[in-house]
Design a protein with these regions (language model features):
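Active-site metal-binding motif and surrounding structural segment of the metallo-beta-lactamase
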Residues: 120-165, 200, 265-270
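Metallo-beta-lactamase
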Residues: 160, 169-220, 265
Length: 319
């Protein structure tokens, strides 16, 4: 076996162990016909490979990088963040570094909905929030759910002193992420350790002052995410969400979950403000959801026709 340590945006120092098996002679050399790579995070299998054939001493050409490339330092990601006004006190932060975040301006502080993708992108988002509304501190980050693409900047947010607003079911998990060892590949939090500050939401949290009101709700009736949150800005009829809908998806397996959440909370949504995608009027959201769901139905039918199964099939929804 071989063991090594690599960096992970969410998990910090991740130890991998590759185990080799099924050795067979190939041109006089005993070589493994399969190997399995497991990480030290819950013994998660990262890669399992079975070899079809080997080629020994084959011509692979010159694989060396040019001298100038070998001598150059590793590039620093150059991120550009755009702040688009959605409504007074609400901006969509988007750009070339990853998923969106949403900036919310209160009377004496700023909040972000989502710290996504990775640490560097989240640092750029926080910097953009501060420059968009100078003089007000960014004090909290509302996180839609625990998936890695939505929490890639969690450790950066903690290092910046932000309070993490999350559904109560995520608290232990986020505390675990904050405690992960990050020594081989240090980040902002390992260089400047701080305790995680969490504000847990059970079902509903109202954030309100003289400038802005935001209702944070637990997501119901959704089998994509556990312990999810969405936010509603009643004054401007905005729904802020991560993974309840994405205009870029081709299929949608979750039936009426979007409208179920809106109806359950008695919201009057006029525009959707997504973490993935672009701001859309609710009529376009409904039209796209219907198209995506019908595409999912067709996919399920194809899968069933060859006697296979797929998670999410058959669909249950009301047209």
């Amino acid at each position: 076996w071989v063991r090594w340590v690599g960096p992970h945006e969410n998990l910090g120092d991740l130890t991998y162990r590759a185990e080799f098996s099924g050795y067979e002679p190939v041109d006089g050399v005993w070589l493994p016909m399969s190997f399995n790579v497991v990480s030290d995070f819950r013994d998660n299998v990262q890669l399992r490979l079975h070899v079809d054939r080997y080629v020994l001493d084959g011509d692979v050409g010159d694989l060396a990088a040019p001298p100038a490339v070998r001598a150059a330092p590793a590039p620093t990601p150059a991120y550009t963040v755009d702040a688009s006004v959605v409504a007074p006190g609400v901006w969509l932060l988007s750009g070339n570094g990853g998923a969106n975040s949403v900036l919310l301006e209160f009377a004496d502080h700023l909040s972000l909905f989502e710290v996504p993708t990775n640490r560097a992108w989240t640092a750029a988002l926080i910097a953009k929030a501060r420059s968009t509304v100078p003089g007000k501190p960014v004090t909290e980050a509302i996180i839609s759910h625990h998936h890695f693409d939505h929490t890639g900047g969690l450790r950066t947010a903690i290092a910046e002193g932000l309070t993490i607003v999350t559904q109560a079911g995520n608290v232990a998990w986020f505390e675990d992420l904050a405690r992960r060892k990050v020594e081989a590949f240090p980040d902002a939090l390992s260089r400047n350790p701080k305790p995680i500050k969490i504000r847990a939401v059970d079902d509903h949290l109202k954030l309100s002052d003289s400038k802005l009101t935001v209702d944070v709700y637990r997501v119901v009736s959704n089998n994509h995410m556990a312990h999810g949150l969405m936010a509603y800005v009643p004054e401007h009829h905005l729904l802020i969400q991560g993974d309840l809908f994405d205009v870029g998806w081709e299929v949608y397996f979750w039936g009426n979950t979007y409208d179920d959440n809106v109806a359950y909370r008695k919201l009057e949504v006029e525009r959707d403000v997504p973490i993935h995608g672009r701001v859309l009027p609710i009529a376009e959201v409904h039209a796209k959801l219907k198209e995506q769901t019908r595409n999912a139905e067709q996919l399920c039918a194809k899968v069933e026709s060859v006697n296979l199964s797929m998670p999410g099939c058959p669909l249950a929804w009301n047209d």
